[in-house]
Design a protein with these regions (language model features):
Chain A
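Short, highly charged C-terminal tails/helix-capping segments
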Residues: 188-234
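Short proline/glycine- and acidic-rich turn/helix-capping motifs at secondary-structure junctions
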Residues: 35-43, 116-120, 192-202
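Activation on folded, globular domain regions of eukaryotic proteins
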Residues: 2-7, 92, 108-110, 131, ...
Length: 234, 565
């Protein structure tokens, strides 16, 4: 299971967001370049079509493959009260033959996309991963080198944290409290719920980018304080 | 000032209490009405009460936060604090007005206040305050105590002016920065910068696009014709995917087959089932090739010239095993036979694997082509039969076209086709068999064939003859395993074709095409299908009882006897 929220940010503010995240998370950012291939199988015998995603991390020296299955989201009154989306997720590393295997099993390519950006992995109440990436589509099959952004001016911000059925409430609250830190720049919501951009984003970005906002760090602690102090000393 | 104000406030409250508490005949001291109005004591009281309430509310909130261990919403709390601040200012203003009228509460000295009054009246500072004051004064007048007083005063005045100027400039800078960063004023509501409407709409559009793309892949799916694999695959995919030249179906298929034999062959089986739906492009691209193959080889069947379809059947004169593809052929369709022969020759020239692949493709094409070829022959049958019932059975994807094919039965369902669809259609075919067996007419032979339940044994020899791939064989066996145990031998199959229908499992999956073949065989070689005619009426009446095998049994028994000649 995982808790996930998504938000958007204008490309011009991405650098400011990076600074903010660096201040809050206290870790170095990791580059992100993932080729995501979404496979769907045709239900032959009346079963439901199932979907599986193959993620190829192109940033590593050797491309590493992961297979991921996203299940249905938690439903119900309790789910509506939680501000994050809780859904089943199964993930595993696989060898590069996974694509062939799934084709043999009858899974066909449904769509593919390329995410280029950066990510932060840190621990704050839960193991949280924040990815900021531009989502690119390929005009020709598998042509990752010629990918163009789906929306050039807007990038996607995703905050995910793995959870289990016992602790998902704590993880959800950890994720949502982390998201409050990002409030000056963007709003995060459940996938599928659109948020729009935040009006204070421009001002917050300016303040983050200015020197008073803290330079990139040698001491995460002080920078955190500095950045935090400026971002909401309104 | 504050301390005095508070004292006054308490004094006033005491006064009010004194006014309220003793309604007795004791002369109540009341303020002069005019003074009361001037002082507006009520207002002060209201303000004091509201301030008290605000503070207590904040305290309660904090208490609640502490108890439930949730993070407080700082925005709200700050707002509440600012409200409290405002109220305090207001009260202080009011008190100032009130305190102008009253200096001290106990007007008369009496025993009660004799001791406390001097303390209240003294203006001498408390010792700590006094020390503080002195030190501050020293600090202030440092270096000036020697000078005469006026100069001291002047110096202090200039100092005050300088400080005042500095404060003002600081305020100015703060205000300017606030404007530049759009922070809003310190007090009062924040004026959030709003986005331009048009811009907001554009952003909203883009956001919807992006979210849809990420979450459900909208806008990322390439239409079928654009799904041509780029010749320059990225590094991580180069070893994984076959790169076809995409020029000719054959060469494509052959190239891909050579590279990915196991997945290809197993894919083919699945694809055959999907073909009728004209499934979208696959990575391997075979299915894209096969529809074109279908159109090019309309009723192609990889049969030999021999009319006998079954390899192991003792009744078949010709040995089918001499060719890799024991496809069956209709005598009635000479044209098709010729075509088949031509294509077979073509196939012979290709390497074996490619033949298989091409056969598979052609089979698939045949399935699609069957409808066209056989419609004319079986018009009457179609009129008689009730397709709806067939659809009620196992809902296979290709139930509809298969229905056609059952009743047409002409074009042979080659063994390949059978096993292509066999696994998924077995149950359906079974049901159909029962009904079809009861139709009459020469054209019913196809029906009969379709209606006949066929077993693994018949399929398997065909398969082994046609498909050398290992993966196919076990799959087929598994698929048909549940079927008629009587059908262990092909010869038995032929003889028991009619009986088979009754006894076969309703739930088992039978390849319909193969059944057609069998029936056709019988028709061709034995001419034993005339016996179906008397049963035509029965069949029609029995069509309703789809699931009821027993109704069909008598018919089957008759036919069996007739068949066994």
């Amino acid at each position: 299971m995982e808790c996930v929220v998504q938000g958007i940010i204008e490309t011009q503010h991405v650098e400011a967001l990076e600074i903010l995240l660096q201040g809050i998370c206290g870790v170095q950012r990791d580059r992100l370049r993932v080729h995501e291939i979404c496979l769907k199988n045709n239900p032959n015998l009346g079963n439901v079509a199932s979907e599986v995603r193959l993620l190829c991390d192109l940033e590593q020296p050797e491309p590493t493959w992961t297979v991921k299955h996203l299940g249905g989201a938690m439903r119900g009154a309790g789910a509506e009260q939680i501000s994050v989306l809780v859904r089943t997720m199964v993930e595993s590393k696989v060898s590069k033959n996974a694509l062939r295997l799934f084709n043999a099993l009858g899974y066909k390519l449904d769509h593919e996309l390329l995410r280029v950006g950066f990510a932060f992995h840190f621990q704050r109440g839960a193991q949280i991963t924040v990815t900021v990436s531009s989502v690119n589509k390929m005009l020709k099959l598998h042509a990752t080198d010629e990918a163009v952004p789906v929306t050039p001016g807007i990038q996607l911000v995703e905050v995910t944290a793995p959870a289990s059925s016992e602790n998902y409430t704590e993880v959800a609250s950890a994720v949502s409290s982390f998201c409050e830190y990002l409030a000056p720049l963007l709003h995060l919501s459940k996938p599928g719920v659109s948020t729009g951009v935040v009006p204070t984003a421009a001002a917050a970005a300016v303040s983050l980018m200015s020197d008073g906002g803290g330079t990139t760090l040698f001491s995460p602690h002080t920078t955190r304080i500095k950045t935090a102090g400026l971002a909401w000393s309104i | 000032m504050e301390g005095v104000a508070m004292q006054d406030q308490s004094q006033q409250q005491q006064q009010q209490q004194q006014q309220l508490v003793p309604p007795q005949p004791v002369a109540v001291e009341r303020l002069n009405q005019a003074v009361v109005q001037q002082l507006n004591l009520e207002a002060v009281k209201t303000r004091a009460i509201s301030l008290f309430k605000a503070i207590s509310r904040i305290l309660e909130d904090f208490d609640a936060y502490a108890r439930t261990n949730t993070t407080p919403k700082w925005q709200d709390i700050l707002g509440q604090y600012s409200m409290v601040n405002l109220e305090l200012f207001n009260i202080v203003d009011e008190i100032r007005k009130v305190s102008k009228a009253f200096v001290v509460h106990p007007k008369n000295v009496n025993a009660e206040n004799a001791t406390i009054l001097p303390v209240m009246l003294s203006s001498k500072l408390l010792p700590e305050m006094e020390i503080d004051d002195n030190s501050k004064r020293e600090q202030l007048l440092l270096g000036m105590q020697n000078l005469p007083i006026p100069s001291q005063i002047e110096k202090l005045k200039s100092r005050i002016d300088m400080i005042g100027a500095a404060c003002e400039s600081a305020e100015k800078v703060l205000a300017d920065t606030r404007k530049a960063y759009c922070f809003g004023t310190r007090q009062g509501p924040q004026i959030l910068p709003t986005l331009d409407k048009g811009q907001a709409l554009k952003i909203q559009e883009q956001e919807n696009l992006l979210r849809a793309a990420v979450n459900s892949g909208e806008g990322l799916r390439l239409p079928g014709d654009q799904r041509q694999m780029t010749p320059a695959l990225p590094m991580h995919l180069v070893d994984l995917l076959p790169v076809g030249d995409g020029v000719h179906t054959f060469s494509d298929a052959s190239g891909m087959y050579m590279k990915n034999t196991p997945p290809l062959s197993s894919n083919s089986i699945g694809n055959q089932g999907n073909l009728l739906q004209a499934s979208g492009a696959q990575l391997i691209g075979r299915s894209a090739a096969s529809p074109s193959a279908a159109t090019s080889a309309t009723s192609f069947d990889n049969t030999t010239a021999s009319p006998v379809p079954y390899a192991n059947s003792p009744r078949s004169g010709t040995n089918m095993m001499n060719t890799p593809s024991p496809q069956q052929q209709q005598q009635q369709q000479q044209q098709q036979q010729q075509q088949q022969q031509q294509q077979r020759q073509k196939m012979m020239q290709l390497p074996h694997q490619q033949q298989l692949l091409a056969q598979q493709q052609f089979r698939q094409s045949q399935m699609q082509g069957l409808g066209q070829n056989q419609m004319s022959q079986l018009h009457d049958l179609q009129g008689q039969q009730k397709f709806q019932q067939l659809h009620g059975q196992h809902q296979m994807q290709f139930s509809q076209p298969m229905g056609h094919q059952q009743f047409q039965g002409r074009q042979l369902a080659s063994g390949h086709v059978q096993h292509g669809i066999g696994q998924s259609q077995l149950g359906q075919g079974n049901q159909l068999n029962r009904h079809l067996s009861q139709f009459s007419g020469a054209a019913n032979s196809a029906l009969f064939n379709a209606a006949q339940g066929t077993s693994n044994s018949q399929m398997i020899p065909n398969m082994s003859a046609t498909v050398s791939s290992q993966s196919l064989l076990p799959r087929m066996q598994f698929g048909l395993a549940g079927n008629n145990p009587q059908r262990s031998h092909a010869s038995q199959m032929l003889s028991d074709q009619m009986f088979n229908m009754g006894a076969s499992n309703p739930g088992s999956m039978m390849p319909i095409q193969q059944q057609q073949q069998q029936q056709q065989q019988q028709h061709n070689t034995q001419g034993a299908f005339g016996n179906m005619q008397p049963n035509a009426q029965n069949l029609q009446s029995n069509m309703v009882a789809l699931q009821n095998a027993q109704q069909n049994h008598p018919n089957f028994a008759q036919q069996r006897q007739q068949n066994q000649q």
